[in-house]
Design a protein with these regions (language model features):
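Conserved NAD+-utilizing ADP-ribose enzyme module
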Residues: 2-12, 18-65, 91, 100-112, ...
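Active-site-proximal specificity loops/subdomain of glycosyltransferases
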Residues: 62-84
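Short glycine-enriched loop/turn motifs at secondary-structure junctions
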Residues: 84-90
């Protein structure tokens, strides 16, 4: 696959880190590195599974609460079925190839990463990484419903590295589009030359 690679060559990436998160402070300030979960194809990745017997009304609160998880849940089902050799989003470190991609992500997702620090990092040792258009995640998180066929299409497009710009998408009867923002999922270890947690 063109968007999947394994290497032991040192490579630079960029990552947003939360200086107020205790785990980030421990990993970055004391150890100077982040490590993904180990790649174990046999272990289940989903912590919570939807109730197959659930049939009652969903409140707006519940809908907002589970929307992000359901996006990850559906992507993980697709990965397990058709892209099992790819890094799992629930185990990987989320990175960016270029500063340009980080700026685009920050502009679109300021509420998510606005208070975080942007750091350059380097891979150490053997690692597996894949590149994907994170705009598919944005589409999955829009407040609309999707049938199983659409969910499968979006999942396959995301995992294969396809860009949203190559498709005409609709949400609630209206055209939906975003510029692509390429994210990297990495299984392995990254080190930081700059361990500082202040700007």
């Amino acid at each position: 696959m063109e968007n999947l690679s394994s290497s032991d060559q040192r490579r630079d990436f960029f990552v947003f880190v939360d200086p107020n998160d205790w785990l980030t402070r421990h990993q970055l300030a004391l150890i100077g590195s982040f490590s993904s979960s180990p790649a174990d194809a046999s272990a289940p990745k989903l912590m919570f599974l939807p109730n197959p017997e659930f049939q009652t009304f969903i409140s707006p609160f519940q809908n907002n609460l589970v929307r992000n998880y359901m996006a990850e849940y559906n992507l993980e089902l697709c990965r397990e079925q058709d892209f099992a050799h790819y890094p799992c989003r629930l185990q990987a470190i989320f990175l960016f190839d270029t500063e340009e991609e980080t700026r685009k992500y920050l502009a679109r997702h300021h509420n998510h990463v606005g208070g975080r620090l942007l750091k350059r990092c380097q891979t150490i040792g053997r690692y597996l990484w894949s590149r994907h258009d994170s705009s598919w995640i944005d589409f999955l998180r829009v407040g609309h419903s999707m049938d199983a066929e659409t969910l499968q299409f979006v999942g396959r497009a995301y995992w294969s590295g396809d860009s949203v710009k190559n498709h005409q998408l609709t949400s609630m009867g209206k055209a939906w589009s975003e510029d692509p923002i390429m994210e990297v999922l990495l299984l392995g270890r990254i080190d930081f030359d700059d361990r500082g947690l202040t700007t």
